[in-house]
Amino acid sequence: MTSRRPLKDHLFNHLFRYHYPSWDQILQELDTLSVATLNPDCHVPALNVEKTLYLAKTIQILVQHRQSEPYLVPAARANLAYSLQQLYKLGNDKIRGVINGMLPLVDAGCIGFERELIKGLPRVLTLQYPHTAPLESEPPTADCTEWCLSHFVGASGRLRSEVRDILTTHNGTCAPSFQWMASVVKKFFLVETVIYEDFQDTDFNVQLNLCFFWTAVVQMYQRCIYEQKLVHIISTSLTLLKSTARSFFAWYDLYRPNLGSAALVKYTEHLIRALTPDCSDVELGELCSHLHHCKHALFSIQ
């Protein structure tokens, strides 16, 4: 059974861990909210204000995610280029030749550069470890998580499991943030002292595995951007915010309780009506402040 809790206890963990959260996650968080009012008649309107405030804060964070969205693929691409450069230093002449065909495309961010990686990285693997069986170069779908994992070398089952979990969270309905992925990425590096009998070049393994990982990450983010996941979830959240707020304002217009300033309440209603899916986090920040006032005023009514 889900525990109910006040908004102040919410850490918005789903928004820290996911650049693209799922709608179900937001609804589950919303359903855990509760309030305690002195006047029982104020309980439902206060809860509606609490939910409106939660949705406003959620949208504010999602808008910030939208602002940083253009940097996701370039950041993953830069990490990919770094690992390719390290492989170039560690590999033999044949491996360098393959990397020379991929690295300029990654550096330039050429359209479709990830397709060349999907073809070229398995070649790097077999050139370094000729005893590895040839694997299917093309992932079966746009999601290349399993392709990525099938090419890992010298990686523990636990690391593979964590990578699968982070790249396929909630059956692909959401995508992780860079901050959350960092907690997994560091584990690639923390195996530098582990030697595998069949894959003995640990330094090489670390960088090659990271190349496979960042290729999958690029594919994941490109899919989210193409599907406009943030646009859809912001619009859906905003629709629910306005609907929830309307219930509160209808109650306020009917009973006219003293919330400190009737003009401020009406101004808050105006701000909510004016919100659009293209709103900024500045507008939402102001709205959150006024909703806090309404909430605490409702709490004090006897």
UniProtKB/Swiss-Prot annotation:
Belongs to the herpesviridae BBRF1 family. InterPro entries: Herpes_BBRF1 (IPR006878). It comes from the Viruses. Plays a role in the activation the host JNK/p38 pathways necessary for KSHV reactivation from latency and for viral replication. Induces transcriptional activation through host JUN of several ORF50-responsive promoters. GO terms for biological process: release from viral latency. Keywords: Viral latency, Viral reactivation from latency. This is Protein ORF49. Pfam families: Herpes_BBRF1 (PF04793). Disulfide bonds: none annotated. The lineage of its organism: Viruses, Duplodnaviria, Heunggongvirae, Peploviricota, Herviviricetes. The gene is ORF49.
